[in-house]
Structures are given as C-alpha cells and as structure tokens.
C-alpha cells in the first residue's frame, strides 16, 4: 500500500490513501454523496464512459485547456466544487482550496456551510467564485446569505 501522495497515480490511489489516513467518519463524509446519491452514480457512470486517448507528442507546444463557465474564463476545465466544513479535512480549509483555485486559474465554490466566510474568501482571492446556498427554514438567514453573496461574489455580465 502507499504511504505517500507521490505514489498516487489515479483517483483510486488518492481514495485509498485518504481512506488509510483519515478518521473513518471524515473519510466517509468526503467519499459519500447527498441524499440518495443519484447524482454521484450518474457522474461516476458518465466518467466511466470517457476514454482519454492522448495524441502523444503531437501539438504539445501550444496546449490550451482554458474554457468558459457561466461567462467566466477558466485556465483549466475543472473547478473546486463547494464542500461544507473543509477544515475537517485540512487546517486551512476553504482558504487553502480557494488559494489553489486562484493559483491554477479556476473557479472556487463557496458553501454556505463553510468554515470560512464569504467575505474572508472574497477579500483573499480574486479567482471566479460561485455560491452554494443550503436553504434554511429561517428565510431571513437565506436572504442575508444571498445578499452577502451578491456583494462579495463577482457575477459575470450575462449576454442576454
């Protein structure tokens, strides 16, 4: 078995290392999915249908992986999805992930159940951001969170 991230070469390797290193409840929180896990299954099935067949040593001098998501240009076709309680997994929590998203020129998703505030993250990084609202019974709290996200998260100009 591996004891180092340097020995991880695919998603399965990272998952096995996380399972070995993390306390069981934290691993299962990260490894699981919401509700009945239908979206998790659909995403997994979709990824299994993809074959990455590289065109080896052909046209690698000008590789451009950039894309546009919701009007925001990203340097890579991936983004850091909103995940609640990230300090459970790492001492920097959302702050560390937001910095990594900025470093790699991609979007960072802020969860309303995060361990860092919308203001803190928005003041720290200029990378494109989105906000995931967990709807609460308290409509006043929902309104306040939406207003904060409108103030602190850049919204691209819509073409319509």
Give the ranges of each region predicted by the language model.
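A short, Lys/Arg-enriched amphipathic alpha-helix followed by its capping loop at the start of a domain
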Residues: 76-78, 97-106
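Hydrophobic faces of well-ordered beta-strands that scaffold small-molecule active sites
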Residues: 78-81, 106-110, 129-133
């Amino acid at each position: 078995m591996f004891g180092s991230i340097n020995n991880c070469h695919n998603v399965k390797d990272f998952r096995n290392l996380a399972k070995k290193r993390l306390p069981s409840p934290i691993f299962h929180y990260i490894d699981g999915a919401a509700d009945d896990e239908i979206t998790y299954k659909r995403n997994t099935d979709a990824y299994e249908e993809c074959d990455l067949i590289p065109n080896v040593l052909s046209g690698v001098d000008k590789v451009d992986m950039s894309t546009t998501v919701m009007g925001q240009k990203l340097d890579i076709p991936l983004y850091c999805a909103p995940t609640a309680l990230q300090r459970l997994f790492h001492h920097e929590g959302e702050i560390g992930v937001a910095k990594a998203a900025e470093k790699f020129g991609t979007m960072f998703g802020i969860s309303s159940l995060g361990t860092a505030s919308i203001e803190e993250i928005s003041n720290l990084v200029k990378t494109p951001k989105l906000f995931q609202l967990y709807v609460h019974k308290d409509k006043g709290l929902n309104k306040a969170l939406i207003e904060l996200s409108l103030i602190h998260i850049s919204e691209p100009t819509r073409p319509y």
